């Protein structure tokens, strides 16, 4: 039931008109950077418009990276009934916003995280390294997970708490814009495919050149 509740909370419930799944991508500008966004991927109807916006919140089906059916509604099982498998954890969520005064991940690793992490790392899934944040710090209950052999893949993840699965945040900057992608920690067992799909997703949101 916990995963069903999370799916219900994550599902956008703002009222809005039906969306044509074949509608063309919207040119949206965030902090001077242009993105071409499928309307069905935009979670809030108020953000489904072209032009300049402060931020946009998106979701895509995984691993196809297709926009979800924005006209579908989540189902809540009857009391006492077993919950059906939820699609919430077959999605990747993306927030695009101005970077502003935020510190990029590469700098955070050098100047902020070392103050809060444990002294020693431990092996993670599929060759990754896990560095736990200490209790009593702002990141308590989270881990820093990265590829020690090559730079580029770094996520901050919550740990599983009972039936609630862990969630990872992956951050990418494009000029002055910050993209934060959220996905289940369990996906890290195939993190190389995750990283490749993230690259493909971000590239699909950018205007084509040439």
Residue ranges with predicted function:
Residues 175-210:
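Surface-exposed amphipathic alpha-helical segments
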Residues 26-30, 145, 170-172:
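Short acidic-hydrophobic surface loop/beta-edge motif
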Residues 1-9:
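Hydrophobic membrane-insertion alpha-helices, especially the h-region
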Residues 77-166:
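Non-cytosolic head/periplasmic domains of membrane-anchored proteins
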Residues 41, 159-161, 183-185:
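A mature extracytoplasmic/lumenal domain signature
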Residues 34-91:
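Extracytoplasmic/periplasmic/luminal assembly and interaction segments
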Residues 162-180:
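Extended hydrophobic
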Residues 8-28:
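Ser/Thr/Pro/Gly-rich low-complexity linker/stalk segments immediately outside membranes or between
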């Amino acid at each position: 039931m916990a995963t069903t509740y999370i799916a219900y909370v994550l599902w956008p419930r703002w009222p809005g008109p039906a969306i044509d799944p074949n509608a063309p991508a919207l040119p949206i500008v965030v902090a001077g950077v242009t993105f071409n966004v499928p309307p069905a991927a935009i979670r809030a109807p108020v953000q489904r418009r072209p032009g300049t916006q402060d931020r946009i919140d998106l979701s895509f089906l995984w691993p196809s990276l297709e926009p979800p059916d924005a006209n579908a509604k989540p189902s809540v099982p009857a009391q006492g009934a077993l919950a059906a498998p939820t699609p919430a954890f077959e999605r990747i969520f993306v927030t695009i916003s101005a970077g502003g005064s935020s510190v990029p991940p590469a700098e955070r690793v050098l100047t902020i995280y070392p103050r809060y992490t444990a002294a020693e790392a431990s092996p993670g899934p599929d060759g990754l390294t896990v560095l736990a944040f200490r209790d009593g710090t702002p990141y308590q209950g989270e881990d820093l997970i990265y590829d020690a052999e090559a730079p580029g893949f770094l996520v901050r993840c919550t740990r599983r708490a009972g039936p609630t699965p862990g969630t990872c945040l992956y951050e990418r900057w494009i000029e002055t814009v910050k993209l934060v992608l959220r996905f289940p920690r369990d996906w890290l067992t195939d993190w190389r495919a995750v990283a490749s799909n993230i690259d493909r997703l971000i590239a699909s949101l950018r205007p084509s050149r040439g």
